From Swiss-Prot:
Site (Arginine finger): 87
One Pfam family it belongs to: RhoGAP
Species annotation: Homo sapiens
Superkingdom in the source lineage: Eukaryota
UniProt-annotated location(s): Nucleus
GO BP: any one term: positive regulation of GTPase activity
Name this polypeptide is given: Rho GTPase-activating protein 11A
Residue ranges of every copy of the Rho-GAP domain listed in the record: 49-239
Keywords: GTPase activation, Nucleus, Phosphoprotein
Length: 1023
């Protein structure tokens, strides 16, 4: 009487509600259609052929059954009393011969022994292409066996009703035969449990002995046997739908049982005006149609309860699925977010998951069902103005949504039930929209927008040509500030040009460094970002280049105005509070403070090239070497502190302007808008410079750190004046570079390369005076300076590392740092793996043994010698030359320490370079012989210098955020540990290995390795 799909849905709902059994992907009637094509291709074979391809015989009361099955069961009925029937196996040779005869169509079963026929019957089921009990139902059938006895039988029989009709006929016939066999169990010893154990692997086609027998396998086999036993015991009820399921269907459909139409097609026929809609509706499953009414029959559940699946239906916002007649009441564009493929997939889920919705919950009589569903469906899928104000992107789609809302309001008022649903919607503030609605690139969205789309696309082309104007706009859109609750009232008042999500994906340029993200949806939003966002895309865009050219002067003028008023502690607090309040909400404050400390730390570590760029006024800026070479006990009130203050104050000033002065004209707007942008741009540029100058800086540090302090104090004033003269043109040049970078993003690599060369050329002069301020300690300023430095370092580290919240931003930023940067490729040569010469390996083994013999003071001292890069020797001569170079460096240090009087007239740089060249010329004759004769005295003289180096360099390592250390010359303490201490001894071993030198190499017959002391396990040997 009822359509088979309706019956199946009612069965699935009942199984899920009463027994907790979910059935996924039941194919049902599709099996017959799938095998019909295969049936024509196969000839007269019997084994390994699907049921549809077999010859059938009509059996009264059972329908059409495969002829082989009928013949086999009829033959075995004559031998039903045979003991161990189906248990005893027949002869394998006879079975093969019998199978061949049957495949060739010979009727030989009547004369065959019963055990052979029984074995052939088992083989027939085992060789079916698909098990007669479909694999889709196996899990549900096994789950049903774990219920109580009565519930187990009912659930198993209900699951059998989900099978296709021809499968039901075959199962009913065969299990009825097996039941007759079990009724004669007193004679044949084969009751239903024994038969179930035998036939379960054949009917369910489990693996035959391939698995190891485990406890899980045994349990599974027992459950499978229980399934077959239940079907044997209740064979006559297989596939018979109970009456209480059939009685539910009229109530499910909301119609009278007496006037019920016999098919689903007749029920749906009059509902659609156009044939296209009717055809689409006929393709749709009745799952969404039926599921709501089935809630009435669930135990202990009232219709007012909204189940989880109903929420899913609401969130997906698809009126086509929510109600059968939503198409009639909603405007045409209501389903604009979904393609037909998406709709089909959702319908498929609704079909088999049977998601219960509240379509019929509010109806008291069956007649009012259609009115309720139309009104409720439209009200659920529509969004009230309160919702729009709270949660959705303000893009070009806003006018479209407002049109839809207006249309739906009219529909709801006409239905007469609008008042019932408005409080329900207003409580749901978080309606999650689907991705296709959010990023709608489809045809429907364009059609609804109408003529406004043309202007929008023209502006898209203009913006693509001038991408610079979109820097802050896309930044603020991406941060999520537009998601805040009160954006809608502000942005339309400002008359901003609206950008849809699809255009935004087209227009997104490379990310800026310091992009802020809004972490929470509930916290207070930043009004200043909204103001800038509203203004920027309109009239202010044309003034961009002028504002860019004006910006450096504005920044420099603002910074000294308030620098004297703020102590470092106030500065840090103010900076923290400003940055914390702008991008993050209240519950993220604890995270933000740690983040900002990291940001400031990375600022100080990335070097004063950043500061030289930012402050034109600070002509006496000292470079990175100052932070790195000076220890805390020697810090003083230097220009560096002013530098830190002005750097912070620029940001603080811009943020104050950003928040408080919103309407003071174009100059005010340029200050608010572009100073954070430039700060972020400097951050990126100085990171590149820091990479390029890292090797040069470390080399300079090695030279300067060994100078005596009294000599440096005498050179202090002259070198300071010299640097001030040389610094100012570089500052002007860097400011010009800064403006160029803001106006033209494409020139970034060029500017970075230019600034790198400048930094290299001027670094030798800058670093000469870096150590000059060591001799004037002032303890009162030390604490302030130290705390300021730590805050600066920690805060700036995280501004580059932790503010990128998206994976794509991480990848883009990382590629910008490591892969796509030509400057980094120039600095670092690729790794070359070569065969190590024998002598060099001997020298390394000797140096490691020598290292293990040193006292702890030597080991600590040698750890400081890590700044020089690892020298890769190509041959024996190359290794020798590298040793000579390292020895020359140390001998020059000793020369400087012994005789500073001779070098007083020189400047710092000239003295060091001259000393190195002179000592390298004299090395083979003097210092090398001295080292050969007196290695201990040389080591003793070098010990203090290496300790001093180690102290300084522990603070002086240049760390860059997001650094990729894969192809760097990685600084390793163990590799260079004997450069300063035992270089003379190594040279001696290389040139002329003596008897004592040969004795160092353990493992010879004279010196077996057992006598030596092994290296400590705590220190890994890195060769």
């Amino acid at each position: 009487m009822w359509d088979q799909r309706l019956v199946r849905l009612a069965l699935l709902q009942h199984l899920r509600a009463f027994y907790g059994i979910k059935v996924k992907g039941v194919r049902g009637q599709c099996d017959r259609r799938r095998h019909e094509t295969a049936a024509t291709e196969i000839g007269g074979k019997i084994f390994g052929v699907p049921f549809n391809a077999l010859p059938h015989s009509a059996v009264p009361e059972y329908g059409h059954i495969p002829s082989f099955l009928v013949d086999a069961c009829t033959s075995l009925e004559d031998h039903i009393h045979t003991e161990g029937l189906f248990r005893k196996s027949g002869s394998v040779i006879r079975l093969k011969a019998l199978k061949n005869k049957v495949d060739h169509g010979e009727g030989c079963l009547s004369s065959a022994p019963p055990c052979d026929i029984a074995g052939l019957l088992k083989q027939f089921f085992r060789e079916l292409p698909e098990p007669i009990l479909p694999a889709d139902l196996h899990e549900a059938l096994l789950k049903a066996q774990q219920l109580g006895t009565e519930e187990k039988n009912k659930a198993t029989l209900l699951l059998s009703c989900l099978l296709a009709d021809h499968t039901v006929h075959v199962l009913r016939y065969f299990f009825n035969f097996l039941r007759n066999v079990s009724l004669r169990s007193s004679e044949n010893k084969m009751d239903s449990s024994n038969l179930a154990v035998i036939f379960a692997p054949n009917l369910l086609q489990t693996s035959e002995g391939h698995e190891k027998m485990s406890s899980n396998t045994e349990k599974k086999l027992r459950l499978q046997a229980a399934v077959v036993q239940t079907l044997i015991d209740y064979a006559s009820d297989i596939g018979r739908v109970p009456d209480f399921i059939l009685e539910k269907i009229p109530a499910m459909l909301g119609i009278d049982g007496l006037c019920a139409t016999p098919s689903l097609e007749g029920f749906e026929e009059g509902e659609y005006e156009t044939p296209g809609e009717y055809k689409r509706k006929r393709r749709q499953s009745v799952g969404d149609f039926v599921s709501g009414a089935l809630n009435k029959f669930k135990p202990n559940r009232t219709p007012s309860i909204t189940p989880q699946e109903e929420r899913i239906a609401q969130l997906s916002e698809s009126p086509v699925i929510l109600t059968p007649n939503a198409k009639r009441t909603l405007p045409v564009d209501s389903s604009h977010g979904f393609s037909s493929k998406k709709r089909k997939s959702i319908k498929h889920n609704f079909n088999f998951e049977l998601l219960p919705s509240n379509l019929f919950n509010s109806s008291s009589t069956p007649v009012s069902v259609h009115i309720d569903t139309s009104s409720e469906g439209s009200s659920q899928s529509s969004l009230s103005p309160v919702l729009i104000g709270g949660n959705h992107l303000i893009t070009a789609g806003v006018p479209r949504r407002s049109k839809r809302i207006a249309g739906k309001k009219v529909c709801r008022v006409e239905s007469g039930k609008a008042g019932c649903f408005s409080p329900k919607i207003s409580h749901k503030e978080k309606v999650r929209r689907s991705l296709r609605l959010k990023f709608n690139l489809g045809k429907n969205g364009r059609e609804v927008n109408g003529c406004s789309g043309v202007n929008r696309y023209e502006s898209v082309g203009w913006r693509l040509a001038n991408q610079q104007s979109l820097k802050n706009r896309i930044e603020s859109v991406k941060t999520g500030l537009l998601f805040s609750p009160d954006v809608d009232e502000k942005l339309p008042k400002k008359g901003s040009e609206k950008i849809s999500k699809s255009e935004e994906t087209l227009l997104t340029p490379e990310r800026l460094v310091g992009t802020n993200y809004r972490m929470s949806w509930t916290g207070p939003n930043n009004s200043s970002f909204q103001e800038v966002d509203a203004n920027e895309a309109s009239s202010m865009v044309e003034n961009l280049e002028v504002e860019n050219s004006l910006e450096p002067d504005i920044m420099v003028e603002k910074s000294p105005a308030t620098s004297c008023e703020l102590t470092p502690s106030n500065l840090n607090n103010k900076h923290n509070s400003n940055i914390t309040s702008s991008p993050l909400s209240g519950d993220e404050n604890n995270m933000t403070k740690e983040t900002l400390v990291k940001v400031q730390k990375a600022f100080s570590e990335s070097g004063s090239n950043l500061h030289a760029l930012m402050n034109q006024r600070q002509s006496s800026v000292t470079n990175v070497g100052k932070v790195k070479l000076t220890e805390p006990s020697y810090l003083e009130d230097s220009p560096e502190e002013n530098l830190f203050e002005t750097n912070d104050l620029t940001i603080v000033e811009s943020k104050e302007k950003y928040e408080h002065h919103t309407g003071k004209g174009e100059k005010c707007f340029s200050e608010r808008d572009f100073s954070p942008l430039q700060t972020q741009t400097f951050n990126r540029e100085t990171t590149i410079k820091c990479y390029s100058t890292q090797m040069k800086m470390e080399h300079e540090k090695d030279i300067h750190s060994n100078m005596p302090k009294d000599y440096l104090s005498k050179q202090e004033f002259s070198s300071d004046e010299e640097i001030k003269k040389q610094q100012s043109p570089k500052d002007k040049l860097n400011n010009k570079l800064k403006e160029n970078e803001n106006m033209m993003e494409g020139n970034l690599p060029k500017c970075a390369a230019h600034s790198k060369d400048e930094a290299r050329s001027s670094f030798s002069q800058q670093s000469t005076c870096v150590v000059t301020n060591l001799s004037k300690p002032r303890p009162m300023r030390i604490a302030k300076q130290q705390s300021l430095e730590t805050c600066e370092k920690t805060v700036s580290e995280s501004s580059q590392m932790t503010e990128h919240r998206k994976v794509s931003d991480h990848i883009q930023w990382f590629n910008k740092l490591s892969l796509n940067e030509p400057n980094r490729i120039k600095v670092k040569s690729p790794l070359k793996f070569q065969r190590t010469p024998v002598r060099q390996s001997v020298r390394r083994i000797n140096s490691l043994l020598e290292y293990s013999r040193q006292p702890t003071g030597h080991k600590l001292a040698s750890l400081g010698d890590t700044a020089s890069p690892l020298v890769k020797s190509v041959s024996c001569d190359g290794a020798l030359s590298s040793c000579i170079e390292s020895a020359s460096k140390d001998s020059s240090v000793s020369c400087i320490k012994s005789g500073p009087k001779e070098q007083k007239s020189m400047s710092c740089e000239e003295s060091n370079i001259g000393a190195i060249s002179k000592s390298s010329m004299e090395l083979p004759s003097k210092s090398f012989l001295k080292m050969r004769k007196h290695p201990d005295s040389v080591n003793a003289s070098l010990r203090s210098t290496t300790v001093y180096k180690q102290k300084i360099l522990s603070d002086g390592q240049v760390k860059v955020p997001l650094d990729d250390l894969t192809n760097h010359d990685i600084v390793k303490p163990v590799v260079n540990n004997n450069m300063g201490i035992s270089s003379g001894i190594n040279n001696r071993v290389l040139r002329r290995p003596s008897e004592r030198g040969r004795a160092w190499y353990k493992g010879s017959p004279k010196h077996p390795i057992g006598k030596t002391q092994l290296l400590p396990t705590s220190k890994p040997v890195d060769l």
